[in-house]
Amino acid sequence: MPTKIPRTNYAAMFGPTTGDKVRLADTDLIIEVERDHTIYGEEVKFGGGKVIRDGMGQSQVTRAQGAMDTVITNALIVDHTGIYKADVGLRDGRIARIGKAGNPDTQPGVDIIIGPSTEAIAGEGKILTAGGFDSHIHFIAPQQIDDALHSGVTTMLGGGTGPAHGTLATTCTPGSWHIGRMLQALDAFPMNFGISGKGNASQPAALVEMIEGGACAMKLHEDWGTTPGAIDCCLSVADDMDVQVMIHTDTLNESGFVENTVAAIKGRTIHAFHTEGAGGGHAPDIIKICGDANVLPSSTNPTRPFTVNTLEEHLDMLMVCHHLDKSIPEDVAFAESRIRRETIAAEDILHDMGAFSIIASDSQAMGRVGEVIIRTWQTADKMKKQRGALTEETGDNDNMRVRRYIAKYTINPAIAHGIAHEIGSIEVGKRADLCLWNPAFFGVKPEMVLMAGTIVCAQMGDTNASIPTPQPVYSRPMFGAFGRSVERSAVLFVSGAAKSANIGETLGLRKELIAVKGTRGIGKKDLILNDALPHIEVNPETYEVRADGELLTCQPAEVLPMAQRYFLF
């Protein structure tokens, strides 16, 4: 017999449904549920007296007959594909189905079969997102991995060998020997990884050697000499071997200006790191290249968003990261040339327009590895407060803005680096690298993180208590982060050439190797919800930035959400 219940009661039991609105953390960002794939009156929920019981919501279907390994019930999915409610079925470490879960023998419309072999994760009242992808990592310290994972990042790509001075400044792992040692080390952590080799060379042989040795991308960094010759050589090798090239251009304009770099690139695909310039690049106008169709522009998180503290902290940060000396006037001038309030303010707006497409960390080298997700949403909130609703919004909500910003650390870096067939969104067939969030803690502290469908960390209380919720509750590693589960739950991304050469066997790696693909010939048009191509001009004297003739400026934030109130203990 059908019955009606108040929306508040329904949301308390089964989570919000179509038309309901949810605030993200303590921001001004409000999302609205666009659609609901569950069926009213046939929702599944686990617990005493609830639906997922033998003969009710749980069928007799075996795993061999198609029952799921795990079902996440009534989750509010926040993804570039939309903001909607659904059950999510996981099988063999991948997203098998998105829709309606239950027992097809007793319920209508079931496309996710729950059987005796199915585990249940309660998604009602929770937000489900794809795991984050940080594509700008300096592998300085292995402890970064914990900070990233517990913030909701499940894939890290970058370079380095530890706290060597080359790594403190540049995201490059130089040479196949170092690449091999790093892949062997990263085999042990519950995280997906990719290694970027050093791309600074004017002849191709050494670059080919690194790509065949396991690098899945190449990095051009000014501290190693990002000359027009090195740029051209690296891109030529990348085009031949299908890996991405990331670039940190010449701040001092020694080997040329931004126009010379653009000429050396010759319209080829390139991922431009910290395209605003505070993290490094042609001063003062590297930001112009975010309007080029072949450039995939990203930010690093210290300038996200522009606040009253941004400029002051950057000078000391830069001196340390690039091995500079405050007693040398030229070093101080170098540092000061990179830090410009006008371009940092413009960067906020260019992100909101969708002209900057990716956000990453620059871990321990002018970036905070555990704050990619927080700072993305702080930027979105600041822009909502300062610019109001986006013109693209179709309702009284921030769905379009939220979809645009989540794409910046999920699908877009995955597209840029040739791994979007594996990660970056909640879509059938992709790896079940997922984050479950309490809406009040969205973007700050994930409730649970899964790698290939296995829980690797979660909020957990006192483990000597009689129940799992007593204080202190904090994020702790779970079973998926231990033993041989690690090698089954995470992968290493390598070049196609390295996989064909069986480097996994040569190096004794136990994680699966996945070849990157489709990194060349793509452009800004391929970056989802972040494909704007404004014509950018920078005044060389005042550093004012204009997009299609319009001055881009905004005030620095004095207070941010998702900050101190979440980190009192």
Curated annotation (Swiss-Prot):
Gene Ontology MF term list: nickel cation binding; urease activity
**Primary location class:** cytoplasm
Question: According to its UniProt record, in which pathway does this protein act?
Answer: Nitrogen metabolism; urea degradation; CO(2) and NH(3) from urea (urease route): step 1/1
Q: Which GO terms describe its cellular component?
A: cytoplasm
The answer to whether the entry has keyword Cytoplasm is yes
Q: Where does this protein hold substrate?
A: 221
- Processing and modification events after translation: Carboxylation allows a single lysine to coordinate two nickel ions.
The annotated active site, in chain numbering, is 322 (proton donor)
Q: What EC numbers are recorded for this enzyme?
A: 3.5.1.5
Name this protein carries in UniProt: Urease subunit alpha
Organism encoding this protein: Roseobacter denitrificans (strain ATCC 33942 / OCh 114) (Erythrobacter sp. (strain OCh 114))
